[in-house]
């Protein structure tokens, strides 16, 4: 056998066949060639590795998809909570006009607590004044003498009725016809004057005049020791009424009546106020009158509305 044949047969193995039907023989078995680069993995191993990597990646995506909705809900809830807190602090800040525009949250809360305590004290004071007025009115009703007398109407009128005039002099029923009309009216006037003198806050001026001042947004009408403010401002301006009440409190004024009406563009405020009676003597000592206080308040309202 030559060298070429030996080299050509190196890739084959010779084996002995042990089959029963033949007496013996040889069988050539092909031998698989050895890999030329044993360091590189086979294609099957690479496929298996890729498949395992894909499975692992799919498992991670599934977990991410399961956790993602809860995380988004948590983010949305936190965002809404912060937005609600900002709105609440903004509304609370609008109710406190004495604070600067850029006040921190702690300052807003402290000022709100102080304002609430001050309002509670004011409420207690007003309740005491109300109770005193009720006691005074009940006492004056019990001490005022009244006279009941009958009068004789015509035949076409209703039966004899009972009247309660304000008079301190009893009148006999038989002297009703002879009682002069002028004397009766004089008694009525004198009784009314005596009753008016017992009022807690009487009006000193017998004749009351109306004085009116007007500007673009403010109309002031003064009647005695009371004033009527007509205010017209653009709608959707927060804190207007609160600022007006704060200004009244600054000048020791009490709000007796307030009405608010609005349309699509404007809001109208009608406020009846008076100077606190306990502060009138202090104003007179400072050389100021009630009218001067009302005018000063109106001027500050004009400046405030012009800045809106």
From Swiss-Prot:
The keyword Cell cycle does not apply. Residues 60-76 have a biased composition (Basic and acidic residues). Its main location: nucleus. One of its GO terms (molecular function) is DNA-binding transcription factor activity. Keywords: Developmental protein, DNA-binding, Nucleus, Transcription, Transcription regulation. Disruption phenotype: Small and shriveled seeds. Retarded growth of the embryo after the heart stage, but normal morphogenesis and pattern formation of the embryo and endosperm. Shrivelled collapsed seeds. The keyword tRNA-binding does not apply. One of its GO terms (biological process) is embryo development ending in seed dormancy. Coiled coil: none annotated. Siliques. Not detected in roots, rosette leaves or flowers. Expressed in endosperm cells. Residues 1-76 are annotated as: Disordered. Transcription factor that controls embryo growth. Regulates endosperm breakdown and embryonic epidermal development. Regulates the expression of SBT2.4/ALE1. Involved in embryonic cuticle formation upstream of SBT2.4/ALE1. Does not seem to be a general regulator of endosperm patterning. May control specific signaling pathways that coordinate embryo invasion and breakdown of surrounding endosperm tissues. Required for the production the embryo sheath, an extracuticular endosperm-derived structure at the surface of the embryo. Acts upstream of KRS. Homodimer. This is Transcription factor bHLH95. The gene is BHLH95.
